[in-house]
Amino acid sequence: MILKFGIERILSSPYPCPSPTISTPATSPSSISPTFASPNGTPNIASSMYPAWVFSTRYSDRPSAGPRHRKSRKRESTGSSGSSEEEKRPRTAFTGDQLDRLKTEFRESRYLTEKRRQELAHELGLNESQIKIWFQNKRAKLKKSTSSVPRDRCSSVTPNPHNHPSIHGGYQLMAQLAKVQARAYMP
């Protein structure tokens, strides 16, 4: 018996699946029916056996939507010492005027458009990435400072869920429930 919402029912195809034809070496790729052929001419049996939603994905095919990887920097030896260090760009030291202007812009809008970022970079004599990173850091700092979790409750390494008051209350509630249930089943 197949239940209306059972696994067998969900996974079963609502349409009868045609039996795939397997091409023999004598069969050329052009003679394969379009239902079973992929764009490169090879048999595509899977696409005929499963509904179309199986092959859909929530990820975009655009190259910019994929994972971002930082470019690795080459290490150079430092002469006689023989040790190698990674070159790092020095930290940007913003002038007071630049900081005032960045703070003013941040109060107006926490997010900049690309055009506004370009204009601001030109006006302040900075590059766009410096402005972008300043805004990212400022948003992160604001989020951290306005967090609802009190600072003294946070662990410096990892949070301990056993120290949370709602969990202790939950344990007490479950213990009380167990007592009530135990009394209900006593003869």
UniProtKB/Swiss-Prot annotation:
Keyword Transcription regulation applies? yes
Q: Which InterPro entries match?
A: Engrailed_Homeobox_TFs, HD, HD_metazoa, Homeobox_CS, Homeodomain-like_sf, HTH_motif
Q: Which residue intervals make up region (Disordered)?
A: 14-43, 60-100, 144-167
Effect of loss of the gene = Embryonic lethality due to embryos with disorganized epidermal cells, which cause morphological and elongation defects. The seam cells in these embryos abnormally fuse to the syncytial hypodermis during embryonic elongation and ectopically express eff-1. RNAi-mediated knockdown results in embryonic lethality and embryos exhibit seam cell differentiation defects as indicated by a decrease in expression of early seam cell proteins including elt-5, nhr-73 and nhr-74.
Pfam families attached to this UniProt entry? Homeodomain (PF00046)
**Mind telling me which GO cellular component terms the entry cites?**
cytoplasm; nucleus
Where in or outside the cell it occurs: the entry states:
Nucleus; Cytoplasm
Q: Which residues bind DNA?
A: 87-146
Please cite one Gene Ontology biological process associated with this protein: positive regulation of transcription by RNA polymerase II
TM ranges are: none
Keyword Transcription present in the record's keywords: the answer is yes
Q: Which spans does this entry mark as compositional bias, Low complexity? A: 20-39
Tell me which tissues or organs this protein is expressed in.
Answer: Expressed in seam cells.
Question: Its Gene Ontology molecular function terms?
Answer: DNA-binding transcription factor activity, RNA polymerase II-specific; RNA polymerase II cis-regulatory region sequence-specific DNA binding; sequence-specific DNA binding
Query: What CDD domains does the record tag this protein with?
Result: homeodomain
**The entry's keywords:** Cytoplasm, Developmental protein, DNA-binding, Homeobox, Nucleus, Transcription, Transcription regulation
Q: Which residue ranges have biased composition labelled Polar residues? A: 145-163
Q: Which family does it belong to?
A: Belongs to the engrailed homeobox family.
Protein's job: Transcriptional regulator which binds to DNA to regulate gene expression and promote seam cell development and differentiation during embryogenesis. Plays a role in maintaining the boundaries between the lateral rows of seam cells and the ventral and dorsal row of epidermal cells during embryonic development. Negatively regulates the expression of the fusion effector protein eff-1 to prevent seam cell fusion with the dorsal and ventral epidermal cells during embryonic elongation.
Tell me which PANTHER family the record gives.
HOMEOBOX PROTEIN ENGRAILED (PTHR24341), HOMEOBOX PROTEIN INVECTED (PTHR24341:SF6)
Full protein name? Homeobox protein engrailed-like ceh-16
Q: What's the source species for this entry? A: Caenorhabditis elegans
